[in-house]
């Protein structure tokens, strides 16, 4: 369903249309359920291609949204608080994205991200198995919180094979890495050896003795972290006492305390055996992401908002080139392709995606990039789009302007979706190099998505404090749709968040990458130092993000928060967790 209006006074008509469609969806779901009962159909037998005429990746009625709004309401329902729909973008770009493009609708011919994941489930062993292709660790496409692996959905582990085996074809040889001579000289702005940031907030390694985090259980963990280096014996004794009050099956506070206690214990006793599993199957990881994606709006918010910025920046362009830093499975792009295929100004004559593999793909990313390119090409073919996917196999630290083919008549977009934080270190040199490379390509728009928490330029105790606040909100946000007795929730928390918590406060070992994240203010400094200026997201993009929360009937504790110069954050209980921005 398209949320678009030709004049700002039509919001009530939109609301009426929404209510009417939802009533129709309820009737369809009831009939669908009756059919299952009559014919003995197993609703958990997943068939990604319910309507063969639609091709793969296009949703039919067999995939109703598990969290769609129920109940009706009259036409005077005041609960549609989106007065800022941007008339320009609604009429020029075709209204942006349909919420169904992100799994919120059941109409035929629309991209369903869950189907995309389910196709990976059926054919995942052809893409991402093996020790050299750890696709799901630190995966920006499949993980909204911590790109660590997760494990869930026992009832769906037995899935039927699908036609994805013909889509993911790793038998075709990978073309050798191509170095394209740039159409015009591309020079990367030189790195300066002076202070890498302007207005750089001062790093404060002193610990906050007045930390007042509630409840007391989390304060006790923070106090333990403060003395973990100076008095490890006392810290260990304190952890033993804390263990009596924590549980991975308790309330959100008890659960987050459980994982922090485990991580601190491992830090104090690095030779002790790990208490959680060290590996998960590819299928489990995909299913776990699906659980998180169904229950929480993080992935949908990030992709929807970034794609809208790209759609608006390229609204009249015939040739579009997207450079994606850190692509894995490409889940972000089908919805954008569908929006481009249906825009009112007509289809682009050419769309190209240059995919730079995420570090999580390991030293041999070729099979995953081939599979991603095949899926996207076949999806674009269904939409009758002239599409090409170019794998960029050069390591990110060796990339330069000649690594990309940039035609002079192309409009270029650069996408950093939950990727740059992986390049953070004690100094911002690597991040600065990547940003200056992006700037040298002269993009029309750069989209940046990052987690909203400071875990980099702070001392250990403050890192624990910030992480406690962040993950307390994350664990609470799972509760509305993943209940206290949910096995799926336990596995997502253990395999995803537990691993990430361990990575940010666990043992300091050589060769282990420390989890580092930064808040939006530091990203602003880094972007501006590289020569970018902020582009405020349109009123339509902001309203669309709010509609996303409303459409899926997520908890009212989720909110969209705007901040200067052009940031938009998804928050839980007023605490920003994930921030998107647009630059040029």
Swiss-Prot record:
Gene, per the UniProt record: SCL4
Region of interest (Leucine repeat II (LRII)), residue spans: 371-403
Compositionally biased region (Acidic residues): 202-213
PANTHER family the UniProt entry points to: OSJNBA0084A10.13 PROTEIN-RELATED
Motif (LXXLL motif): 420-424
Tissue: Expressed in leaves, sepals, filaments of stamen, and in the central cylinder of the elongation zone in root.
Region annotation Disordered: where it falls in the sequence: 166-213
Biased composition (Pro residues): 173-188
GO biological process: regulation of DNA-templated transcription
Gene Ontology MF: a single term: DNA-binding transcription factor activity
Entry similarity comment: Belongs to the GRAS family.
InterPro entries documented for this protein: TF_GRAS
Taxonomic superkingdom: Eukaryota
Annotated stretches, region: SAW: 506-584
Pfam families referenced in this protein's UniProt entry, alphabetically: GRAS
Naturally occurring in which organism (per UniProt): Arabidopsis thaliana (Mouse-ear cress)
Record region (Leucine repeat I (LRI)): 211-270
Domain GRAS as annotated: residue spans: 204-584
Protein name: Scarecrow-like protein 4
Motif (VHIID): 320-324
């Amino acid at each position: 369903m398209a949320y678009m209006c030709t004049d700002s006074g039509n919001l009530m008509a939109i609301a009426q249309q929404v209510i009417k469609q939802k009533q129709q969806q309820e009737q369809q779901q009831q009939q669908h359920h009756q059919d299952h009962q009559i014919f003995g159909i197993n609703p958990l037998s997943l068939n990604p291609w319910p309507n063969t005429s639609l091709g793969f990746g296009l949703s039919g009625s067999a995939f109703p949204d598990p969290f769609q709004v129920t109940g009706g309401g009259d036409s005077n329902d005041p609960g549609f608080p989106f007065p800022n729909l941007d008339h320009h973008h609604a009429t020029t770009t075709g209204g942006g994205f349909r919420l169904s493009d992100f799994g919120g609708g059941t109409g035929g011919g629309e991209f369903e991200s869950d189907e995309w994941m389910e196709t990976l489930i059926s054919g995942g062993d052809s893409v991402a198995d093996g020790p050299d292709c750890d696709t799901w660790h630190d995966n920006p496409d499949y993980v909204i919180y911590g790109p660590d692996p997760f494990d869930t959905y026992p009832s769906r582990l037995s899935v039927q094979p699908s036609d994805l085996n013909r889509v993911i074809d790793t038998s075709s040889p990978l073309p050798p890495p191509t170095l394209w001579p740039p159409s015009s000289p591309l020079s990367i702005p030189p790195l300066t050896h002076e202070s890498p940031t302007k207005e750089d907030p001062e790093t404060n390694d002193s610990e906050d003795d007045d930390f007042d985090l509630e409840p007391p259980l989390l304060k006790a963990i923070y106090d333990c972290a403060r003395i973990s280096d100076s008095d490890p014996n006392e810290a260990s004794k304190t952890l033993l006492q804390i263990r009596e009050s924590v549980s991975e099956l308790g309330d959100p506070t008890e659960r987050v305390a459980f994982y922090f206690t485990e991580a601190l214990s491992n830090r104090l006793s690095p030779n002790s055996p790990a208490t959680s599993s060290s590996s998960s199957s590819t299928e489990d990881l995909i299913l776990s992401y699906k659980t998180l994606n169904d229950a929480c709006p993080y992935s949908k918010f990030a992709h929807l908002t970034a794609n809208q910025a790209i759609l608006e920046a390229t609204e009249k362009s015939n040739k579009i080139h997207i450079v994606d830093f850190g692509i894995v499975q490409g889940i972000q792009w089908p919805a954008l392709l569908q929006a481009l295929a249906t825009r009112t100004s007509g289809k682009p004559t050419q769309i190209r995606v240059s995919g730079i593999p995420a570090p999580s793909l390991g030293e041999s990313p070729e099979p995953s990039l081939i599979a991603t390119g095949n899926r996207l090409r076949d999806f674009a073919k269904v939409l009758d789009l002239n599409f090409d996917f170019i794998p960029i196999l050069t390591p990110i630290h060796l990339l330069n302007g000649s690594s990309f083919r940039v035609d002079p008549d192309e409009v270029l977009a650069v996408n950093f979706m939950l990727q740059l934080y992986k390049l953070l270190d004690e100094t911002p040199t690597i991040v600065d190099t990547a940003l200056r490379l992006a700037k040298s390509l002269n993009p029309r728009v750069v989209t940046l998505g990052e987690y909203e928490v400071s875990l980099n330029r702070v001392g250990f105790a403050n890192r624990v404090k910030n992480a406690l606040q962040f993950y307390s909100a994350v664990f609470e946000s799972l509760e509305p749709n993943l209940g206290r007795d949910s096995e799926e929730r336990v596995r997502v928390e253990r395999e995803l968040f537990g691993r990430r918590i361990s990575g940010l406060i666990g043992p300091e070992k050589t060769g282990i990458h420390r989890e580092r994240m930064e808040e939006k203010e530091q990203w602003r400094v880094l972007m501006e130092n590289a020569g970018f200026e902020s582009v405020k997201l349109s009123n339509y993009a902001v309203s669309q993000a709010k509609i996303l929360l409303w459409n899926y009937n997520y908890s009212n504790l989720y909110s969209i928060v705007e901040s200067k110069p052009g940031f938009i954050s998804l928050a839980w209980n007023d605490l920003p967790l994930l921030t998107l921005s647009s630059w040029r």
